[in-house]
Each structure stands twice: as C-alpha cells, then as structure tokens.
Amino acid sequence: MTQKITLHDMTLRDGMHPKRHLMTLEQMKSVAQGLDAAGVPLIEVTHGDGLGGASVNYGFPAHSDEEYLGTVIPLMKQAKVSALLLPGIGTVDHLKMAHGLGVHTIRVATHCTEADVSEQHITMARKLDMDTVGFLMMAHMNDAAGLVKQARLMEGYGANCIYVTDSAGYLLPDQVTERIAAVRAALKPETELGFHCHHNLAMGVANSIAAIQAGANRIDAAAAGLGAGAGNTPLEVLVAVLDRMGIDTGVDVWKIQDVAEDLVVPLMDFPIRIDRDALTLGYAGVYGSFLLFAKRAEKKYGIPARDLLVELGRRGMVGGQEDMIEDTALTMARARGLTVNA
C-alpha cells in the first residue's frame, strides 16, 4: 500500500455547488487559511464548474475566479492552489490567467469517454510547467478497459496525474478497485493516479481507501464534506482513518476537525447530508451538481426531484447538460397532465 498520500481539498470548489457559487471572499480566506494551517497540501479554488463557469447555465458567482484566486493564493504559507477547467467552459485564456495568478495545479476535466477534447488544455498546461491533471468524470459510465484508453490519451497529451472521478457517488468499493487497478497498471510508473468521489451512498471513505489500496496516491475530499449532492468524502474523517492506518498525509487530525466544525459547517446554507434526493443521485448514477437544479425544477413544475433524477439517470445525462434538466421536467409534467406556467 502507498504510505504517502496527497490529500486535495474540494471545499472551495465542489463546495461552491451547495453555496450556489456565492461564497464571499472572506469565507474563502477564512477556510483556505484554516486548511493551510492544518497542513492540507493542495486546495482547489474556483467556480463549482471550474474556470469560466460563471454563466446562465451554471450560475453566476459572488466574485470572479480572478478575485477568488487572487485573494487566496497570496495568503498560503505551505499549501498550493489548484483550479478545475472543463474544456468547453474554460478556455486556454482562463488557463493562462490562472497560471499568471500563481495556480500550481490545473485539473482538466472531461466526461470519461471524451478525453480527446482535453488535448489543447493539457498540452498548454505542460508548456507552462504546471502540475497537470487529467480528470475523467462520471467514471461509472465507462468500464475499466475504457477508462484505461482515456487515461492513456490524457497521459499522452502530457498529464502527469490522472484522476478516476466518481462524480455521481455511484461506485462501490470493488468497482473502484477494478478501475483504479486497471488504470494504475496501464500508466507509466511516474504518472500519479488520483480518485475523487461523492458521499451519496456513504461510500466516500470506503471508496477512497479502496482506491489507495489499488494504487491511487492523490485523494480528493472536503472539510465537513461540503460539495455537490451529499458532498465529497469528508476530509476530517478520511484524515483520521488514514492516520489509524499508518498512512502519512501531513494533515493534522485535530486541526482539520476544527476547520470542518468551526469554519465550514457555519457557512452551510443547509446540512450536507444523504437526503432522499442525494441518495437517488448515487443510486441512479446522476451527476452531483444536478441536485439543486432538480430541486428548483420540482418547485417550478411539480415533478418530485427524486423522480426527475431517476429519469435523468435513465437518459444517461452527463455534466454539462444542466439545461436539459428543465426540459426533462417540463416533458414529465406535461406527460402527467400537470399545469405548467410558461
């Protein structure tokens, strides 16, 4: 088993989803400084949908990516800052902006069958000498052999780390083991391997341990689990478990608990928990950030969010198709004879 694991905090990026991207600069500063002091080595900061995510489709943030990054990066004493970039949302210009502000790690994210769209962004990030990560989302929608092909593409473009990403919180530990082990065996020994998951089936910690045992050395988590759906793997819990297992993370067991309890929980707009809708995300294999969109559509069209999420899963909807949630709700409402106000 790998004895040194890099933990990557998601509180200030994935945690933007339940905050509707409206975190204040003061909240960002407070949490980032707490994470830094607790020894977290890598902290992601951006709009929930990555660089350039500010839009009608995904939601407008309280501040620009430049403001968030420009506020947090100068305050870090040991932690590095990462940014997420989804080709088609974020551009090479966004990438250059992030690099100019001092972003250390760029994570270029695509659907798990579409690694080919990442070539331009990964190639540019490597030219800029950034820590360059290929991030394969919705990994339950591709089998181990398929993920291997996609991972090799990203590695070939220049990514020095590949992530298997359970965006829906759908995978079970044996499925994580199968995918991670296959990708690990296929990559160059020097290429790092990461795992990101959601806690929709309460599998966050178990799946992260399975990933580590199968060869992953970077693991995503969030303080108090703040993230889309039922949240990400709770960082403070994962740190405690890894400490008991004798795995070095460099994160202080007690300080990270205090960050979660004293800084992150108070800024939650609602409890991050496995309610029936978040559970349905995991059960039906639906992209985590769809949750609030489905709840809004329930209020507008009278279709229970759970029913809508199941239908989205049946249709195989993926990240980036947020605009189709409303369309699906409208179709379902009409099919059920519900009155829809235009």
UniProtKB/Swiss-Prot annotation:
Substrate binds at R13, D14, S167, H196, Y287. Signal peptide: none annotated. The active site is at H17 (proton acceptor). CDD domains: DRE_TIM_HOA. It holds the Pfam family HMGL-like. Mn(2+) binds at D14, H196, H198. One of its GO terms (biological process) is catabolic process. Keywords: Aromatic hydrocarbons catabolism, Lyase, Manganese, Metal-binding. Its EC number is 4.1.3.39. It catalyses: (S)-4-hydroxy-2-oxopentanoate = acetaldehyde + pyruvate. Residues 5-257 form the Pyruvate carboxyltransferase domain. It is an enzyme of class 4 (lyase). HAMAP family: HOA (MF_01656). PANTHER family: 2-ISOPROPYLMALATE SYNTHASE 1, CHLOROPLASTIC-RELATED (PTHR10277:SF9), HOMOCITRATE SYNTHASE-RELATED (PTHR10277). Belongs to the 4-hydroxy-2-oxovalerate aldolase family. This is 4-hydroxy-2-oxovalerate aldolase. It comes from Acidovorax sp. (strain JS42). The lineage of its organism: Bacteria, Pseudomonadati, Pseudomonadota, Betaproteobacteria, Burkholderiales.
